[in-house]
Regions:
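Conserved helicase RecA-like core
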Residues: 1-193
Length: 193
């Protein structure tokens, strides 16, 4: 299986969870996300060589699109003909971050007969187009959380947003959470602190 994530951080989180549950199963997992330090060529080469050595012994690869494509193009004997499953985690973000061309090239390497799982928080035209590229139309099954509902947002859910200058963001979030300690709150932000 190959699991594609849009960022190194998300791939790392997925890998950490897989390691926790993996100890109860007989499969191996590998993380190929590229070097952390783009300024040190020697470290990048060492990371790449280490990844090359681990790929043949791995059942499940967790990777970023760019690094997977680099291995597909440069790692001798890296054969993906036996891949049975492709997981596109946060497919909308993969496309938003400019990996469309890389993704299309990756799909060209993979066997047509495979299971593809596409996870996306949004259903954009790009995500639907990606689904047509990567999924056999005869076997498409769309799972929507609110398919049968007239209204997607529950009536008792209160949604709001605040536009805050970046320098006040942390204080604003802290103040909001502190004043709503007894409430169930989810905060979505475009950037991390």
């Amino acid at each position: 299986a190959i699991v594609l994530s849009p960022t190194r951080e998300l791939a790392g989180q997925t890998f950490a969870v897989l390691r926790k549950i993996g100890k109860f199963h007989k499969f191996s997992a590998g993380l190929i996300i590229g070097g952390q330090n783009k300024n040190r060529k020697a470290e990048q080469n060492n990371d790449f060589q280490r990844e090359q050595q681990s790929i043949p012994t791995t059942n499940i690869l967790i990777c970023t699109p760019g690094r997977l494509l680099q291995h597909l193009e440069q790692t001798p004997y890296f054969n993906v003909d036996a891949v049975q499953m492709l997981v596109l985690d946060e497919a909308d973000r993969i496309l938003d971050m400019g990996f469309r061309d890389q993704l299309v090239r990756i799909l060209d390497y993979l066997p047509a007969q495979r299971q593809t799982l596409l996870f996306s928080a949004t259903q954009t035209k790009d995500v639907k187009h990606l689904a047509t590229l990567s999924i056999n139309r005869k076997t498409v099954e769309y799972v929507g959380v609110h398919d049968q509902d007239d209204v997607v947002t529950p009536e008792q859910l209160k949604q709001s947003y605040v536009v805050v200058p970046i320098e006040h963001k942390l204080n604003c979030v802290y103040s909001f959470l502190k004043s709503h300690l007894k409430s169930k709150t989810i905060a979505f932000m475009a950037t991390c602190f």
